[in-house]
């Protein structure tokens, strides 16, 4: 649902012409409600839509012609689904040797490669859900993080394949997968286990790495996360907050020593922070250069002054509403990557794309009448 579209989004935002080939009824994510309502609008800006029935020979022939003129094809179907329709890498490569074919799956080659998968499936089997939740209750991360990660890695692979084609003149098969993306994200925990012999604890009960790395309440019932992770930062904190006794306490000389003293140190710091209003504390921490963060909800970002000032939110028209979504988290030559077009209506660009393949207006209408192609 998200892995393939997120790959296309990265390429589209970077300037590629990305054509979304979807069924005549439209991509299923267009109809999701509730927690899924944001999927389609977030991952489909800057794309064109061709709505076509791939179960029909005429529909497949049109897509073959489109692929013949394309640099890249991406697919995010169940294993074997496109092969059965005649769109295998081998067949398309024979038609277009320069084609880069990117397959986004649950698993790379190996014993699991034929399994269908989902973001949550691989979060569970890849250990991320264990590290996120409680020991007895694994919990998926609060975003489709593996779908997005797998799609982003796919885009990186495509860019590398394009660069390789400049040298060799040949296309290639690129594969990205959810399970391997999850393993990549939990690599630090795997390495910790092998290096120390200790099983990493979930984040909910994890033994701290830093002496001060906590959420604190403020005088006005606010909350701030504060991180003091270096000895220099500790010196700054003690000096600026007037806590000289903590500065000279031999038990707190290094981060490792502060970790051991957290049992009494964190309550002491909580008392200090509790004297301040949230905004006053935030202003002071920013002024002295210590890491901090308010505890925000996703919708709070719609009014975030940094995102608003930096062009980090893109305005889009979706279902007769105006919404705002984050831009790709990049600047190129000091410029944020913006929106060229809103998420497309089903088949919005069908006439344009079919004309580019040599179809006359009458031929396009015949395809519509046969329900092979859908237009708005």
Question: What feature does the model see in each segment?
Answer:
Residues 286-308:
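Conserved PLP cofactor-binding pocket of PLP-dependent enzymes
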Residues 129, 151-171, 184-196, 238-245:
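Oxidoreductase and adenylate-handling cofactor-binding alpha/beta cores
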Residues 25, 106-108, 178-183, 220-222, ...:
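Glycine-rich beta-alpha junction loops
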Residues 109, 135-143, 166-182, 201-208, ...:
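Conserved Rossmann-fold dehydrogenase catalytic segment
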Residues 212-288, 292:
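Aromatic-enriched alpha-helical interface/lid elements that frame and gate functional surfaces
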Residues 217-219, 300-376:
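Terminal low-complexity tails and localization/encapsulation signals of metabolic enzymes
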Residues 144-159, 178-186, 229, 233:
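Mid-domain beta-loop-alpha active-site segment that forms a flexible
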Residues 1-157, 161-167, 316, 345, ...:
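N-terminal helix-loop segment corresponding to the beta1-alpha1 unit
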């Amino acid at each position: 649902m998200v892995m393939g579209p997120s790959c296309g989004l990265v390429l589209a935002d970077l300037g590629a012409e990305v054509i979304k080939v979807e069924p005549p009824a439209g991509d299923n994510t267009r109809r999701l409600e509730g927690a899924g309502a944001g999927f389609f609008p977030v991952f489909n800006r800057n794309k064109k839509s061709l709505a076509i029935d791939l179960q029909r020979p005429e529909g497949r022939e049109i897509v073959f012609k489109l692929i013949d003129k394309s640099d890249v094809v991406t697919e995010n179907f169940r294993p074997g689904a496109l092969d059965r329709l005649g769109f295998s890498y081998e067949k398309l490569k024979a038609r277009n040797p320069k084609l880069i074919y990117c397959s986004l799956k649950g698993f790379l080659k190996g014993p699991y490669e034929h399994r269908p998968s989902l973001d949550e499936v691989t979060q569970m089997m890849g250990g991320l859900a264990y590290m996120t939740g409680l020991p007895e209750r694994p919990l998926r991360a609060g975003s489709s993080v593996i779908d997005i990660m797998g799609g982003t890695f796919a885009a990186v692979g495509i860019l590398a394949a394009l660069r390789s084609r400049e040298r060799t003149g040949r296309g290639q098969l690129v594969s990205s997968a959810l399970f391997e993306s999850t393993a990549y994200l939990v690599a630090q925990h795997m390495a910790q286990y092998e290096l120390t012999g200790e099983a990493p604890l979930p984040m909910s009960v994890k033994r701290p790495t830093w002496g001060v790395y906590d959420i604190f309440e403020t005088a006005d019932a606010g909350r701030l996360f504060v991180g003091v992770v270096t000895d220099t930062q500790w010196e700054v904190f003690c000096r600026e907050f007037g806590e000289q006794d903590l500065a000279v306490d031999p038990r707190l000389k290094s981060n490792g020593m502060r970790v051991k003293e957290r049992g009494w140190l964190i309550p002491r710091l909580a008392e200090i922070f509790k004297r301040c209003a949230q905004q006053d504390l935030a202003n002071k921490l920013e002024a002295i250069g210590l890491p901090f963060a308010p505890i925000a909800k996703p919708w709070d970002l719609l009014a975030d002054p940094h995102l608003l000032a930096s062009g980090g939110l893109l305005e889009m028209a979706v279902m007769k509403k105006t919404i705002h979504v984050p831009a790709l988290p990049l600047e190129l030559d000091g410029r944020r990557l913006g929106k060229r077009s809103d998420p497309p209506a089903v088949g919005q660009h069908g006439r344009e794309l079919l004309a580019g393949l040599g179809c006359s207006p009458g031929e396009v209408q015949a395809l519509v009448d046969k329900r092979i192609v859908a237009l708005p």
